[in-house]
UniProtKB/Swiss-Prot annotation:
Disulfide bridges in this chain: none
Source organism of this protein record: Candida glabrata (strain ATCC 2001 / BCRC 20586 / JCM 3761 / NBRC 0622 / NRRL Y-65 / CBS 138)
Site (Important for catalytic activity): C305
Domain Tudor-knot: residue ranges: 24-75
Protein name: Histone acetyltransferase ESA1
Any one GO BP annotation for this protein: regulation of transcription by RNA polymerase II
Amino acid sequence: MAGAEVEEEAGIPKKIESTEEVLIKCQCWVRKDEEERLAEILSINARVSPSKFYVHYVNFNKRLDEWVTGDRINLDKEVIFPRPKRQLEEDTNKKQKKKKKFPQKAAVVESDAKSSEMGEGSDVMDLDNLNVRGLKDEEISREDEIKKLRTSGSMIQNPHEVAHVRNLSKIIMGKFEIEPWYFSPYPIELTDLDVVYIDDFTLQYFGSRKQYERYRKKCTLRHPPGNEIYRDDYVSFFEIDGRKQRTWCRNLCLLSKLFLDHKTLYYDVDPFLFYCMTRRDEMGHHFVGYFSKEKESADGYNVACILTLPQYQRMGYGRLLIEFSYELSKKEGKVGSPEKPLSDLGLLSYRAYWSDVLITLLVEHGKEVTIDEISSMTSMTTTDILHTLKTLNILRYYKGQHIIFLNDDILERYNQLKTKKRRHIDAEKLLWKPPVFTASQLRFAW
């Protein structure tokens, strides 16, 4: 098996007496939530007393990484130290020499196995290859995944930045205290502070409450600095041009990076439009979430980055953002898809949205419909539609063609959707025309 060949290099277990002996890349047992978890030391801050250690819990999401003090590290158990680089190279060379023995025999066995699999039921098309190249069920390392990221849009190839240690401990926005998930390139003077204050309306950042309150008294802005293109009794949407509102959009990118890992946001915001969702009260329009969109996307993406702030998550706002992005695509007369790769939370949200839209359309349409017709009605790409149908397990191969089969589970899910009181975007309240940019307006300075 190919997977058996990939082995993690074992470290050197060692008993230590003090946390002063702990080094970066060591693995040790750390107390968290009344249990001990194996964690890797990513950084050490010796400028404070007592020293703090930035840890990543092995096999857990990166957003759980945190700073811990030495008293949470269990020194009764052995600490695993990384092997010296020279020893690693010697071990790697030995393994490569072993792999060179009998390579042809292994290859023949593998090819025979593949040919026997293809021989049976070869008249059934493999749905994994239906216009969905690049989404195979394969395991790739984090480094390989970073190399595959796009270098246009909201992505850049910078593995060092992706691996940064989270640098802010806590932010306060309005009445909410929020713990950031990831690194964001805020000014270095803010990184040693216990709390950073971020204004609810301008997204400007401050190192002290006094600075923030003085600024708030003078600032009159009470909504995102753009055109309000949608309003209902629940939310509003504003369209902001990154070229016209650089400072506000850069502040938005800094805030977003605290909660987005895969996406590495450009500091140059000129190529993007930002669509910001707000909730209104007597104070003004409070920022809830947003998605950005390239003014001219060569890949046909209708979303570059999408985020609902943590204090508003699990309240249906993310779904409204997704729905709104497709309403814009319908107005443009185009199909669209979010920029890949999506974050884990983003992927779950999109899959749920695509599934619900397709189930509702297929049940209520009640007639034969092609994939292209579904695409034109929903503005979803055929790739996203086929993936979703495959995930729902309702795409069948029958008499030489693919058909969509609505089983009892799908009908039951449709009935459940109808009983849910979800909010939706009212297309009639969208006052917007697709912006048109000249060649000079799309010429961005670098």
